[in-house]
A protein has these predicted regions:
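N-terminal intrinsically disordered/low-complexity leader segments
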Residues: 1-5, 75
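Helix-turn-helix
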Residues: 9, 17-59
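Conserved phosphoryl-transfer catalytic core
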Residues: 51, 60-76
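Hydrophobic alpha-helical connector segments
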Residues: 70-108, 160
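Amphipathic alpha-helical packing segments from all-alpha helical-bundle domains
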Residues: 87, 105-109, 122-148
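Short alpha-helical scaffolding segments that buttress acidic/His motifs in well-ordered protein cores
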Residues: 92, 96, 111-118, 163, ...
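All-alpha amphipathic helical-bundle segments outside canonical DNA-binding/catalytic cores
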Residues: 148-164
Length: 171
């Protein structure tokens, strides 16, 4: 079996099991058993359970952030035409839905995992997400703040989180 195939099998199994059982309740042994690979394969390819979790999130967030940043660049290329609040909110949803799925329920599983990341104690993951993907989200939030100056930034922040949470829990 090719290394890349092993990595994909592990990530697929991890996504499914973490979404079903949560992070703490899912062991590496359970993941490798479901993936049909040797237990040592996780340490070889990822180094740790934390790194596996981060790699799992990168599968969706990497392409999503690239497409979100591209779309923001495209819309901001014409500074004389500012997008509306509704357009910016639509951009976020459109880019999330535009990530090419590997299977039919990828987005649903990812949203469930994202909800778990914030409801279970996954401090390492929150820190990782901020370090790796925070730049594009900060840019997005600044644009929202510009087009909705009457709303306090903290309120916009929580409204966007509520919107994403509603999307996550409805899938």
């Amino acid at each position: 079996m090719a290394q890349s195939e092993t990595v994909e099998l592990i990530l697929d199994a991890a996504e499914q099991l973490f979404a079903e059982k949560g992070f703490a309740e899912t062991s590496l042994r359970l993941i490798t058993s479901k993936a049909g690979v040797n237990l040592a394969a996780v340490n070889y390819h990822f180094g740790s359970k934390k790194a596996l979790i981060q790699a799992m999130f990168s599968r969706f967030l990497g392409p999503f952030c690239i497409s979100l940043e591209r779309e923001l660049d495209r819309r901001m290329a014409k500074p004389e035409v500012k997008p509306s609040l509704e357009e910016l909110l639509a951009v976020l949803v459109e880019q999330a839905l535009a990530v090419k799925p590997r299977s039919g329920n990828d987005l649903s599983i990812f949203m469930r995992l994202l909800g778990l990341a914030f409801s279970q104690s996954q401090g390492h993951l929150r820190k990782y997400l901020e370090e790796v993907y925070g730049k594009v989200f900060r840019r997005y939030m600044l644009l929202l703040n510009e087009v909705a100056p009457r709303l306090p930034p903290l309120e916009i922040f929580w409204r966007v989180h509520f919107m994403l949470g509603a999307a996550a829990f409805s899938m």
